[in-house]
């Protein structure tokens, strides 16, 4: 009886298996789509997506700016209308010349305060 030394396996073991079944092949992770696209293609697609997102963001910002400008025009128009109505009410109570003087004074104050 000779010493029973285990015969070296035909394939080189990369690492020792945790469960001790070293005669089985090491399993690799199941990745069906793993190597189908190259890194350069993925990088190009990512770059293209980023460009599209940037363009969409610019469009959204432009649309929002137009919307804000429209809102601002409406507010200015309403303020002018209210001011005109206020002066008309004042004109009913006072003389025309005095209303014009008050208008000038308010415009001066508005310019100084702004």
UniProtKB/Swiss-Prot annotation:
GO cellular component: nucleolus
Region (Disordered): 1-47, 77-114
Coiled coil (residue ranges): 40-101
Chief location bin: nucleus
Composition bias, Basic residues: 94-114
Keyword Methyltransferase: no
Subcellular localization(s) per the UniProt record: Nucleus, Nucleolus
Signal peptide: none
Basic and acidic residues composition bias: residue spans: 77-93
Residue pairs linked by disulfide bridges in the UniProt entry: none
Bias (Low complexity) ranges: 1-13
Keywords: Coiled coil, Nucleus, Ribosome biogenesis, rRNA processing
An individual GO BP term: rRNA processing
Reported function: Involved in nucleolar integrity and required for processing of the pre-rRNA for the 60S ribosome subunit.
UniProt family annotation: Belongs to the CGR1 family.
Protein name: rRNA-processing protein cgrA
């Amino acid at each position: 009886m000779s010493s029973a030394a285990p015969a070296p396996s035909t394939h080189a073991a990369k690492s020792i298996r945790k469960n001790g079944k070293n005669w089985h092949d090491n399993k690799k992770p199941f990745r069906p789509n793993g190597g189908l696209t190259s890194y350069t293609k993925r990088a190009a697609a990512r770059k293209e997506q980023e460009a599209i997102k940037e363009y969409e963001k610019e469009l959204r910002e432009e649309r929002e700016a137009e919307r804000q400008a429209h809102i601002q025009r409406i507010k200015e128009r309403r303020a002018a209308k209210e001011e005109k109505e206020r002066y008309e009410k004042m004109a009913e109570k006072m003389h025309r010349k005095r209303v014009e003087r008050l208008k000038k004074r308010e415009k001066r104050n508005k310019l100084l305060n702004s």
